[in-house]
Amino acid sequence: KFYMTTAIAYTSGKPHIGNTYEIVLADAIARYKRLEGYDVYFQTGTDEHGQKIQEKAEKAGITPKEYVDNVAGEVKRIWDLMNTSYDNFVRTTDADHEKQVQKIFKKLYDQGDIYKGSYEGLYCTPCESFWTESQLVDGKCPDCGREVKPAKEEAYFFKMSKYADRLIEHINTHPEFIQPVSRKNEMMNNFLLPGLQDLCVSRTCLLYTSDAADD
């Protein structure tokens, strides 16, 4: 068995050359592995939730679902035009996908890996990222250089900190786990060793999203 997946294209706009570059490389790997005799399952798809999508749909005068339907259709058309050999194209608005997300969320919540708290920070809408004051560059988003706005909301968090020591030990004892070495060093030095932060896994201020919990 050989399972592979691409990153899923974000549907706030039409696919770009980076998306195309990735799907071509992934397709080449999938085809090569099939020639080697592997039973390959190759998956790709689209990410269809987020504030940028909500805002662009409002600007276009259509519903968010209509907006992502158009973009996802264009992504799939281009992938098919290039004869990519994916086995499954997943949209995050698919009913089956949403059910699985809710199932996993509930399981993690019930076992104490997800908890409710509040998130406060400086929010960059184009990047859909929260930042602290110390992370800003000249008072702006360190990724895109745009303005950020103060934001605070009730949210659910995944206890990544709970697994930090386990991850560090596994990476140290399995040096091939993250490749290339530069990415392993980046993960260790920038995230794990300074203290892994819990991850915010919900947004309460969006109208167009997938319901993860009853509230």
Identify what each model region corresponds to.
Residues 1-205:
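N-terminal, positively charged nucleic-acid-binding surface of large information/translation enzymes
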Residues 146, 214-215:
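Disulfide-stabilized cysteine-rich extracellular repeat microdomains
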Residues 208-213:
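Conserved small/polar residues in nucleotide/adenosyl-binding loops
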